[in-house]
Amino acid sequence: TGLLLENLDAHLYGGAVDKIVLLIGTNDIGKDVPVNEALNNLEAIIQSIARDYPLTEIKLLSILPVNEGEEYKQTVYIRTNEKIQEWNQAYQELASAYMQVEFVPVFDSLTDQAGQLKKDYTTDGLHLSVAGYQVLSKALKDYLF
């Protein structure tokens, strides 16, 4: 969140924008950034967008799940789905404070029965595969159109 906040102007070009989709947070968790620091950064990002693009809808996606299987430990590192869900709850609460922000819960659409990122949907336990992105895009369709 900190890096996006620092470089937000580089990602937004000043033209008319209908919707902005934010999918951020997993790198903060991987770097052990405190949730309050990430929330402060996220709120600053939302406020900056709301100030510069007052008619733009902001879609805040839930942080995606990881697969905590042993074969993925090196990539997933310290991320856990329990921590991700805690952050997602905090994201949802933050989003509810802003009329222009809608929280988009996509976490469950990517998990298996054990609550892990489905192996078919990941390349390394953290990043999505083509199949994972297809499921994500299907989950987003109702929120974007």
Give each language-model segment a name:
Residues 66-145:
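Catalytic His-Asp segment of secreted/periplasmic serine-dependent ester chemistry enzymes
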Residues 37, 55, 59-62, 66, ...:
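Flexible domain-boundary/linker segments
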Residues 19-24, 28, 57-62, 102-105, ...:
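Structural recognition of the beta-strand scaffold that forms the well-ordered cores
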Residues 17, 39, 57-61, 128, ...:
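Generic hydrophobic/packing signal
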Residues 9, 13-16, 25, 43, ...:
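Sec-exported extracytoplasmic/periplasmic mature domains
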Residues 1-47, 82-85:
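Conserved SGNH/GDSL esterase-like catalytic core that processes O-acyl groups on lipids
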Residues 1-11, 48-57, 96-105, 131:
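Phosphate-binding glycine-rich loops and adjacent basic patches that engage nucleotide phosphates
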